[in-house]
């Protein structure tokens, strides 16, 4: 569901069920925030690494604080522009545009 609260519940369960767990990779940064909260509550900050996607400002703060290992910046702003351009091309020509590659950047404490 991409929600911070639900991610915290799921991460807490995973941490309980798998005491040797070393990392959690979350599908977005909101879920990563929930996972970080669960790791913190379990007293396992530093022992369990957490990563996310989207590069939101709240994730950046946790990276700077050492609670979140990294986030992936998928450049959503570019994806939105490409989506609009694709739609306009389809409307104008009826042709389906070729795939476009967009960069994905790993954001760690070294980039902040």
List each language-model region with its residue ranges.
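Hinge/beta->alpha junction and helix N-cap segments in small-molecule ligand-binding domains
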Residues: 1-10, 26-31, 54-58, 74-79
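Alpha-helical elements of Rossmann-like donor-binding domains used by nucleotide-donor carbohydrate transfer enzymes
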Residues: 9-13, 34, 82, 86
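Glycine-rich phosphate-binding loop signature in dinucleotide/nucleotide-binding domains
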Residues: 14-20
């Amino acid at each position: 569901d991409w929600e911070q609260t639900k991610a915290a519940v799921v991460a807490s369960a995973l941490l309980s069920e798998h005491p040797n767990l070393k990392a959690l990779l979350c599908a977005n940064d909101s879920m990563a925030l929930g996972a970080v909260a669960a790791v913190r509550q379990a007293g396992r900050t530093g022992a369990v690494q957490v990563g996310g996607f989207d590069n939101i400002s709240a994730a950046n703060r946790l990276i700077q604080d050492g609670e979140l290992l990294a986030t992936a910046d998928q450049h959503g702003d570019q994806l939105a522009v490409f989506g609009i351009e694709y739609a306009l091309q389809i409307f104008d020509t009826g042709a389906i545009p070729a795939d476009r590659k967009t960069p994905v950047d790993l954001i760690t404490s070294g980039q902040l």
